[in-house]
UniProtKB/Swiss-Prot annotation:
The keyword ATP-binding applies. A motif ('KMSKS' region) lies at residues 242-246. Belongs to the class-I aminoacyl-tRNA synthetase family. Glutamate--tRNA ligase type 1 subfamily. PANTHER family: GLUTAMATE--TRNA LIGASE (PTHR43311), GLUTAMATE--TRNA LIGASE, MITOCHONDRIAL-RELATED (PTHR43311:SF2). It comes from the Bacteria. This is Glutamate--tRNA ligase. Its EC number is 6.1.1.17. Keywords: Aminoacyl-tRNA synthetase, ATP-binding, Cytoplasm, Ligase, Nucleotide-binding, Protein biosynthesis. GO terms for cellular component: cytosol. It comes from Neisseria gonorrhoeae (strain ATCC 700825 / FA 1090).
Length: 464
């Protein structure tokens, strides 16, 4: 059997971080088992679904690196209405579905009664049964189509995350599978799609647990083999509440890219939200695919931790090849009015500073002083700069100017003799030198920094 999983987002807005985590686990499961990962766009909500939102989903999937095996044949539900109508007609013909002519007022009264009695919402008054007389069909009413849910027994499955789940059928409504205007409903479309796509494992959020028994019963009615189900726990924000844009949480996957997060780091972090491989916190995408197993997914909600995300991102920055990192940082430097034609070469700068930042924006800022002296912080000036330091910098500039070979070793070899002559420790030279040349007291090894900036620029900055 070829494992087939799917990700089925609705194009009604941004691509939510929770949705991406669901897609990631579904993708990793398929890749681990050498199977197929499929994309389906659930766009039956015609009022809210937009082409722009579809593009946001596709762009988000591309950014985060989740490739899907039906890229040339992505399933769009709005293109499959004829197929849904065909299956509905089959269910009606077999007696597994029926027309319901209830008015909104009747349904509201049933809902209120059901809330008081703790029963299923719909009283099945239009459900055909042997020996039952149905109401007279009202004039001018367009009916909905309901699925004929089994009344006896239970619907149960072994959830790949939550374990055994059993729902009494008497607790289930006769689900509406087609609205009065003829359009099919979500639960029905999803079932037909999963059947036609050959999906073997449905991995999704645990907000779909209540949909599962309804969908299982429909699958049985159309004669389908049942897939296996795994329902993933919710992701909470740092306060332990549901992630919400209204609460100020970052929820759209593209926002994390703007924050300077690498897609590899995002996948690494999302993988750890609910799944574990021993004590491993940092790993590559290839390792994740090799290690992934749904039995290692916790059924309990996980909580966002942005500090950990940034730490993981910093670790991924360190192992990113300098050439690739250059292409990622280059546009961020352009926004800071630093362009690729300027010296020193950005790739050389990044090789020196890449372990000093936890996101690409901070990394771009870390590069700035190689191209333009920055305005030093008042606290650094107060601590490391005075008239004596200024005079000492001018004396050291004379030593630098005398160097024939401009490289880190040659610059480093000047430090000890100069400090001995001045009767100072290295800190009294290094910190003011950083301020004079870079505008900050926090840099990598000062000899390496000066070597990259160039002799001409270093002397000009010191003597400015």
């Amino acid at each position: 059997m070829t494992v087939k999983t799917r990700f089925a987002p609705s194009p009604t807005g941004y691509l939510h971080i929770g949705g991406v985590r669901t897609a990631l686990f579904s993708w990793a499961f398929a890749r681990h088992h050498k199977g197929e990962f499929l994309l389906r766009i659930e766009d039956t909500d015609l009022a809210r679904s937009t082409a722009e939102s579809v593009n946001i989903i596709l762009d988000g999937m591309k950014w985060v690196g989740l490739d899907y095996d039906n890229a040339d044949n992505v399933v769009y539900q709005t293109r499959r209405f004829d197929r849904y109508k065909e299956v509905i007609a089959e269910l009606l013909a077999k007696g597994d579905a029926y027309y319901c002519y209830c008015s909104k007022e009747e349904l509201e009264a049933m809902r209120e009664k059901a809330e008081k009695e703790g029963t299923a919402t719909y009283d099945r008054r239009w459900r055909p049964e042997a020996g039952k007389t149905l109401p007279e069909i009202p004039a001018g009413v367009q009916p909905v189509v309901r699925f004929k849910t089994p009344l006896d027994g239970v619907t149960k499955w072994t959830d790949l995350v939550k374990g055994e789940i059993s729902i009494p059928n008497e607790a289930l409504d006769d689900l509406i599978i087609a609205r009065a205007d003829g359009t099919p409903t979500y639960n029905f479309c999803a079932v037909v799609d999963d059947y036609d796509m050959g999906v073997t494992h449905i991995i999704r959020g645990d907000d779909h647990v209540n949909n599962t028994p309804k969908q299982i019963n429909i699958l049985k009615a159309i004669g389908a083999n049942l897939p296996e189900y795994g329902h993933l726990p919710m992701i909470l924000n740092e306060q332990g509440k549901k992630i919400s844009k209204r609460s100020g949480d970052t929820v759209a996957i593209t926002d994390f890219g703007a924050m300077g997060i690498l897609p590899e780091a995002m996948l690494n972090y999302l993988a750890r939200l609910g799944w574990a491989h021993g004590d491993d916190e940092f790993f590559t995408t290839e390792q994740f695919i090799e290690w992934f197993d749904l039995k290692d997914v916790s059924p309990s909600p996980s909580r966002m931790d942005l500090k950990k995300l940034y730490w993981i991102n910093g670790e991924h920055i360190k192992i990113t090849p300098d050439g690739k990192l250059t292409e990622l940082v280059k546009p961020r430097l352009a926004l800071r009015d630093i362009h690729e034609t300027e010296k020193p070469a950005l790739e050389d700068v990044l090789a020196l500073v890449k372990d000093r930042a936890q996101d690409l924006n901070a990394l771009a800022d870390e590069c700035l002083y190689f191209y333009k002296k920055q305005v030093p912080a008042e606290a650094d000036v107060a601590k490391h700069w005075d008239d004596e330091a200024a005079a000492r910098m001018l004396r050291f500039a004379e030593r630098l100017e005398g160097l024939e070979d401009w490289n880190a070793k040659a610059i480093h070899d000047l430090f000890k003799p100069f400090c001995d002559e001045e009767g100072i420790k290295m800190g009294k030279l290094g910190m003011p030198l950083r301020l004079a040349v870079c505008g900050t007291a926090k840099t990598p090894s000062v000899d390496a920094v000066l070597a990259l900036i160039s002799k001409e620029k270093v002397l000009k900055r010191i003597r400015a």
